[in-house]
Structures are given as C-alpha cells and as structure tokens.
Amino acid sequence: MATRRLQTPIGLRFAAPLRRVLNRIEARLDSERERTGLWLPVALGTGIAAWFALPAAAHWIGLLFLLASGGLAGLLIGWSSRIGRMVVAGCGMTAIGVLLIWARATWVGAPVLAQPATTAFSAEVEAVEPLPAKGETRLILRPRGRDDLPPRVRVTLRDQAGSTIVPGERVGLRARLMPPPAASLPGSYDFAQRAWFDRIGAVGTVLGDISRAPDAGQGGQPLRARLSEHIHRQIEGSPGGIAAALVTGDRGAISAEDEEAMRRSGLAHLLSISGLHVTAVIGFAMLFARRLLALSPRLALGGYVLPLAAAAGALAGAGYTWLAGAEVPTLRSLIAALLVLVALLMGREALTLRLVAAGALLVLVWRPESLVGPSFQLSFAAVTAIVVLHESPVMQRFMARRDEGLVRRWGRGIAGLLVTGLVVEVALAPIALFHFHKAGLYGALANVVAIPLTTFVVMPFEALALLFDSAGLGAPFWWIAEQALRLLIALAHHVADAPGAVATLPRFPPWAFALAVAGGLWILVWQRSWRWWGLAPLLAGMAVLAQQPRPDLLVTADGRNIAAAVPGGGYALLRDRAGDFVRDTMNEAGGSDAPLGALAALDHVECNVDFCRWIQGGRIILASRGRDRIEGSVMAPACAAADVVISDRWLPRECVGRWLTIDRDSLAESGGLAIYLGEKPKAVAALTAGDGHPWRNAPQVSGNDEAVPKAALAR
C-alpha cells in the first residue's frame, strides 16, 4: 500500500504562526520598554496574593515549582528577547513574593489563646488608645510571668479611667479573654489574620477595676496623647475628634454616626493620615522654608534653597509621621513623599508611575501582608489613577497654562479636580465594594469641596492654633478650624443622606475581584492601544460583581445570629437584640443598606420559645433560638420536615434536615455561612477546609493558670 509523504511537519505548521505572534508581542513590548519595569511590583504582589489565596504549604510549594518552570521557559525563549526577560523577571518576582510573605508570616508567629478564658494577670502596658466617643479605652498589654498567655494581648476597658494609663506602666487586672476571631461571615473582616501579623494572641474585656502602682502615671502622658487631649479641650465632640485625627491620628472621639457619614460620602480617607496629609505638611514646610531661605542672597545664588527646603520638608514629614504614631499607612505615605523629594532634587519629574512602583516595591518588601488590606489597595490605586490621568495628552492639554481670565482659570482648575475625583472614584469602587460591600457614589463631588477645605483651611489654621497656643493666642485660629470642621461634617451628612448616595453589593468571589484588578492594571500601566485589551477582564469582573445574587440566609460562626432575606430587600434577624457590630456585618455581607427587622415579627414566620420555622426560597427553614434542652426523639419529626436546620447548639443525631444541618460542630469547621437557596442551592463557608495558613494553625496557650492573685502587680 502506497503512502503519501507528509508535506509539512505538524511542529513547523504551528511554528510559523507562533513566531509571528511572538514577534508582534516583542514589537509591542519594545514600543513600551519604558513601562515594562512597572510590572515588577505587580508580579511581587501577585506572589503575595497567591500565598494568601492558596490554602496550604503543598500548594505554595507547587506554585514555586510552576514559577521555576516558567522561568526556565523564559530562558528557552531567549534572554536577548524582551519577552524572555519579562517572563523570567515576572516568574522570579512572583516567586519572591510567595517566599517573602511566607517568611514574614513565619517570623511574626506567636502563641494564640486556645479558648475563651477568664483570668487575672499582671502586665506591662505597651500602647493606649482612648475611645472617648464610645466611653472606652483600648490597651495593648504584655503579660508578665504568665507563660500560659500570649505575649501580646488587646483588652478594652469600658470607662474613661483607662485614658490616664501610660505606656510602660505595670498594671494588674482581671479580664475575659478570647482568641482573635476569624471572619464571622464569608467576605467579612478576618481579624485573626490581622492579629497574627500584629502578634496579638488574645482580645477581651477588662472585668472590674485595674490595679495600678501608687506612683502610676506620674511620668505623664506621651506627647501624642497630651496633644490629642489638648485638641479635645479646644474643640469638643466629633469636630475635635477629626482635628485630633488630622494631627495625631487619634480617631477615638469621632462619633459613630459622623464616621459612618464620612464613609458613605466618600470622605473617610480624610480621617486617616495618608498621602494627602503628609503631602500637605511637607508642602507647607517647603514653602515656608523656601521663602525664608530665599532672603539670604548667598543661599539663593548658590542654589542651596531647594535642597535645604526639601530637607526641611522631609524633616517635617518625618516628625508628623512620628507624631501620628508611625502607623503603616502613614509610613507608606512618607516613603512615597520622600521619593518625590528625591526626584525633585535630581531634576526629574516629581510624580511618575516609576516612583509609584518604587514606593509599592518598598512597602511590599517591608510589610508584604499590607497588600491584602484595603488601605494599601485604595491608596496605590488612587495615586496610580491620578498619575495616569495627568500623563494623558488630553488632560495635559486641558490643564496647560494659558493666557485667560481668573474666572476661566479657576473654573478649569475646578473641572480638573472634578474629573480627577471621578477617575479616582471609578478606580476605587471595585476595591471598596470588595472589602466593605459598599461604595459612595457622590464622593467625587464631595471631595471637590472637602479636600481644599481640609488642606487649605483646617490643617493650616490648626497648625497656627497649636503654634500660637504657646503664647495663649490660639483661640481665633481654633474657632476658624472648628467652623471648617463643622462644615465638613455637615457636607458629609448632606451627601450621605442624598438618594442613591451609596451602592451596596453582597459578597462576591475573590477571582472576580482579581479579574477586575488585572484588567484595570493593564489599562493603567500600558500607554499604547493594546492597553484597552484590559477592558475585557475588567468588564467581566465587574459583570460578576453586578450580577452577584444576595444570600438568602446568613449564619454567623457561633450560630447565634441568623439573618434571612425579606421581600423588597433587606434582612430580618432571628435574635433582634443583636448589637451594632453584628447588624453592620450582616448588612455588609448581604449587600443591604436597610435597617434589619425582627424575623419573628414577619407574617410568614412561625415561632415558639425554642424554634422559628418559615419558608425561604421554596425551602423550609427551622432555626433554634431557645436554651432549654430538647430530647432528640422530640426534635426528629420537626427536623425531618425541614430542608435546612440551624442551631447554635449541638444537635442530637436524630435531628437531620433534608438538605443541610448546621450546628456547633459543623460551624466549628466551616465558620460563618452564606446560604443561597434556589434550583441549585449552595452554602459558602467563611473558612476553607484544610487551610494551612499559620493563623489557622497557631501554637496555642491555655490561659487557665490562676496562680497570680487578682490584683497582683509585677514588681
């Protein structure tokens, strides 16, 4: 039998098209060679994010092998090609990100309390955070002589007396302690993760009074605390709380209502010391220093004015950061500001994406865990969006200086500020929706007034008031600052109360958020036409966000709090006496902004002392709410007639729902649940089975050693 010879080998048949594709990509990368380095922090962050997303060490090691294979593939492509170098560098930086966060999580490891415990102990006070708006004081303590307690404990003292406690003081107390709580619902805040990196092994509440040494507190409060107290004496209430927050970072005196209004109006960023505040301080310090130094002909003619003014600005920024407590967001802003000053001194453009990328690299190497927090994501997303917008030819032409009247120039400036605000709000919306399940829609308009008001009125007059207080002449400046702050709060409430001011969404999959972020980065980093390829993943991710259904049932990790979706939007609680924290958590997880009602008050719900029964999504729900013991034989018929059975207690074997049975044992493994009832019902758990992250498998201490007397003080 004759055979026909294969004319073209299969490998060669695909080689030519592949080569053409690679050549086109190579040409595009070469045309954007100045932007390729911007992907280094993205690759580093991808490795860090992958470590958080993957559950166990086997997956992390597998990812490292996969990245090593990718690096080898890049070498095979060729180091001389830009594609090969980018593949090698990208895989290498991603692997470094995995190893960096893995090492950091291991290095900060400390024992965690195994179970709730009530115990007396003595401790050294490490930090004091007054919360006058709540009538509380928060303390970070280092227990002494108690190996059965974690090395750092955070407790809350429910009175104002704790505000006189100073760091370094030794105290004796009795407290109800518990392990740092994990996320109570899918997508909600995971304090256990945050506490692990802060080395906090237990949280709790002080019971009774704190015992202090007779001479305790005579050394005086730290400068930061004294300054906050002085500001609160000059301006009372929430305006004083915001004034203190702008100087020392102390937000404890801001009422919950005003803080929520700031958040809903898109002005919450003004309450945390960040790039805006640090930049304002450095800018005013440089302006003052330049005007003063320019009076010296020798310095002016010698070209020393700008370097000395930059040094003065750097010192002012560093001092401000130290005064504000040197928190991670403030330090991050200081690093970025110092990079801008270095660029100015080198004669380079002040703010570019390269500087933003360098700042991101420094922060991720220093604190890799900050990547998954909203603060890092919001700040770098905002700065990146602003830089990209003002690099665009259209914006540069619009903002270019020209001969025109004062009104037109001011109008153009306001329009530029409004456009910038809109772009920033669009960039921040997916992040806010992912972390907080809500986003203010009118933030751009509110910030047009709020940012200049804060930067050019509140902060300068507050600084002048503090300066003139040394001579007893600060009262007029305090009055002006207070009126501006009251105007700011009124603006926040007006915007927050406007119809449609807040968009809410329920929890959505992390992969959809990652898809939207990847698309946004592709658009922001590149400059050529292929940047718009990023619209595909961006719109796909946003489509998932917009179409995400709200859960029919929400069950917290302890099983005590259950929220059921009600017709027309909103949720109703099984136990309607739940506190504000539980209510806020339920509303956020369900993507609702409506007040929570009482489940027992609904017409379609049948309740007795022990149980409530209702139909949800075509399925029968049975939830326990009593504390009395019920025999399994008595419960069995009711459980068998229900599709879903929920209890915060251990259920007997006889109690089994037709589809899902939830009790204390199952919740210990799954954590809180979001339940979707429909044709294909599903339950999404807050905890991942087999999660190997260190805060899920931490070394534990009992906290049960009562050898220390109740009021003992370590000597």
Language-model features, listed with the residues they occupy:
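Divalent metal-coordination and catalytic microenvironments
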Residues: 47, 123, 175, 246, ...
